Design a protein with these regions (language model features):
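Short helix/loop capping segments that flank catalytic or ligand/cofactor-binding pockets
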Residues: 53-56, 178-181, 263
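Structured, hydrophobic secondary-structure cores that serve as assembly/anchoring elements
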Residues: 44, 50, 65-67, 73-99, ...
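Glycine/small-residue-rich hydrophobic helix-like segments
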Residues: 200-248
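Short, compositionally stereotyped local motifs that mark structural "simplifiers"
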Residues: 277-357
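Extended, solvent-exposed, turn-rich assembly/linker loops in the middle of proteins
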Residues: 129-200
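Extended, compositionally biased alpha-helical segments that mediate assembly or anchoring
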Residues: 240-284
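N-terminal "assembly arms/tails" that initiate or stabilize quaternary assembly
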Residues: 1-77, 270
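Alpha-helical scaffold segments that mediate packing/assembly in large oligomeric complexes
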Residues: 94-160, 276-278, 357
């Protein structure tokens, strides 16, 4: 906040407003868990496993196979973002400035220029960091390649059984010309010509497109494809107050507070795809098992490998352990290990898995 308060002599009473950007994430996520955060900071959700399909045996006691207790995993969401702002509008200053600082108007300005951008940028960063599918591109998208990259993203999601509806493509603003001028965009999208004429981005291959200011897109990400059911962003408190002549102040005191957070739903993480710059995604670990001992390795120098043996996804699980070559995990016969690589400044790898046979 600037420190100057300009008292009017012969100035216009009109305030020059700045450009701003409406929220681009508000309709991008599921609200299925919002009510679960009422009255609590932490919510835990179950992921229930399934049983294997066996060959039926027509004799003996366990004809359907050997019964095993159905297992489950627990994923934890902890709401940590608690932000506030405050400012005053002194009655004397207001009188000497043509009352240009109206509390209601200034609060709306605060929301659109400070609060909304902060929440949008935070959400996108969290969702990108937790993306279930992260692919590093060999080069930045161009007019000749961007269409194929988007189709590849679609195919990767399809192969993970992500529903084909409720997907949204978030594209860096600087990449819009490459997409709008690509031959695939004109040929495949019936709204292509209209979009070019009006300057409004519509759909590409059936996917709604939203462009994002380059500075809002997570670092080293070209575009994100998000399925609505894969991301959540609960808002526990969204409170704004205007106090008139509170104790100690002749004028108005404006206060605001938001308690919120953003998460990727672990069991649906494949519904978030990011296309990144080259070398910005950790390589998927390799797993080798000998004498019931698991050896994990990653081709990404300096990466940390997280692993689980309870069936949960190591990228999101509270039971994940950090791998050390000095203390390799020991597996029972038939036990499965899952591993993923993480590193600061890079996006997480895919999950590798292997069963001790």
């Amino acid at each position: 906040m600037g420190k100057t308060i300009n008292l009017a002599e012969k100035y216009s009473s009109q305030v020059q407003e700045r450009f701003y950007h409406d929220s681009i994430t508000q309709g991008a996520f599921s609200k299925s868990l919002d009510m679960e955060f009422t009255g609590v900071k932490t919510v835990k959700v179950y992921d229930v496993a399934v049983a294997p399909l066996n060959d039926y045996t027509r004799s003996g006691s366990n004809r359907y196979g050997t019964p095993q207790e159905l297992t489950d995993n627990i994923y934890e969401f902890v709401m940590n973002m608690d932000k506030g702002f405050t400012y005053t509008i002194d009655k004397g200053n207001a009188k000497e400035q043509f009352n240009i600082k109206q509390a209601g108007t200034s609060l709306r300005r605060q929301m659109r220029e400070v609060v909304t951008p902060y929440i949008d940028i935070y959400r996108m960063k969290v969702w990108a960091k937790g993306a279930g599918i992260a692919k590093a591109m060999s080069a930045a998208p161009s007019k000749g390649t961007i269409g194929g990259m988007i189709f590849d993203a679609q195919a990767d999601m399809n192969n993970k059984f992500v529903p084909k509806t409720n997907r949204t493509l978030y594209l860096k603003e600087s990449l819009l010309p490459a997409l709008a001028l690509s031959t695939e965009y004109i040929a495949l999208d019936s709204t292509g010509s209209k979009a070019l004429e009006t300057g409004v981005v519509g759909k590409y291959a059936g996917i709604p497109i939203k462009t994002i200011p380059d500075s809002w897109m997570p670092e080293n990400v070209y575009f994100m494809l998000i399925h609505k059911g894969s991301a959540i962003s609960p808002m526990k408190l969204n409170e704004y107050k205007i106090h008139t002549d509170p104790q100690g102040i002749s004028g108005q005191l404006v206060e605001g507070r938001v308690i919120f957070d953003a998460f990727v739903i672990p069991t649906k993480a494949d519904g978030i795809y990011i296309a990144t710059a080259s070398g910005k995604v950790c390589e998927t670990p390799t797993i080798s098992i000998a004498s019931n001992s698991a050896t994990l390795a990653s081709g990404t120098s300096g990466a940390t490998i997280k692993y689980t043996t309870d069936g949960s996804d190591p990228r999101y699980s509270s039971t994940a352990k950090i791998y050390s070559g000095d203390s390799k995990p020991t597996l029972a016969s038939g036990e499965e290990i899952k591993a993923a690589a993480i590193k600061d400044g890079m996006y997480q790898s895919a999950v590798a898995s292997k069963t001790n046979t």
